[in-house]
């Protein structure tokens, strides 16, 4: 019994000696914690056993100022935990030399008040925030383009100011409503200077000249335009002259701009005035109405007019002679029929008037004068106004005796109006009147006013 006690004492002594050795000496603590911590040692086996039994322990309401001891981590566990830990969630980490190995390459470096990153990326040029690096890369190119454009903004503003001043003066000049000839005089002056800048004759203008005075002196903004391009007003021999030195390259460019803007505004003003202007009423032609007694068709077809009706000017006579020479030369060649008809149509264009007679069923003949370019419905209106029954429908037959055809009243939809010249009713023609009678409307002849002025056809 005593031997057993002695052996037990020896075993306990060995256990105490091994626990107090240098290998296991010291107090267990969490890495990074203070060595002065006085927390009692924790048995890892007991801790593991307790954690397996209660994985979700209820936290105590009493706060513990000292950190709880944790299980020491091996070197491999430290590497894994260090690599998976987000550096942005570590409020203690702060770069000493300004370089953060865990930070984004392009970042706004702005932190929220809670201590975590906003995951925003900023442009290194304009400092605008973006949500991704791709958006920053796309934005940088446009941002660089904007900075290059800002460098030339001052020069662009100067050009715009010069242009606006030039435009204002041109508008003021045109608002004075100068005549077309006055604008042409000013344009001719500027164009001559650009074309021959060394010619002093174009660079010295006498303001008392009648055309210059009308085009520039009497129009608001005219003198200012001269001064804008480089002219100076001087007095010589009791007269005012606008004198200009040899224009520089910049002045030549400015003169060209003024010329172009003047021509542009001139075209716009003329176009707008043409749109605003009311459509011009067609020139009223004197029909020179005459009415003849009942005669036969052969007698009515003999139309005799005075020589003045066919009177031609000197230019028309010369043109007629040229046409005759061409006709003689072309008669010796084989010419297609279509070309001959085209030539005959061109020959009829020299007539300015056409005398047309309309023969009615009772033998009365109505005569009127028309222009070759008038449409055929003008002939129908003329005949309708002469009837006692203006609402009577009728047709006018072509003067061709072989096969009479109806002269069209109105053109087909989508076609241009047919003229008297197109129907070969120039320079004179005799056409027939054919009424379209109904039970209520019949042909009753011409109006009494026209019958009273009727005369025999000699």
From Swiss-Prot:
The gene coding this protein: PUX2
Phenotype caused by lack of the gene: Enhanced resistance to powdery mildew with a reduced fungus reproduction.
Cited function: Facilitates the interaction of SYP31 and CDC48A, thereby regulating an CDC48A membrane-associated function. Appears to act as a negative regulator mediating the powdery mildew-plant interaction.
GO molecular function: zinc ion binding
Entry keywords, A to Z: Membrane, Metal-binding, Ubl conjugation pathway, Zinc, Zinc-finger
Pro residues composition bias: residue spans: 56-70
Record note on domains: PUB (PUG) domain is required for the interaction with CDC48A. PUB domain may serve as a protein-protein interaction domain implicated in the ubiquitin-proteasome pathway.
Annotated Polar residues bias: 44-54, 74-85
Domain UBX: 349-433
Annotated localization: Membrane
Induction: Induced in response to powdery mildew and by benzothiadiazole (BTH) treatment.
Descriptive protein name: Plant UBX domain-containing protein 2
GO biological process: defense response to fungus; response to fungus
SUPFAM superfamilies per the UniProt record, alphabetical: PUG domain-like, Ubiquitin-like
Record's GO cellular component terms: membrane; mitochondrion
Membrane topology: Peripheral membrane protein
Pfam families membership: PUB (PF09409)
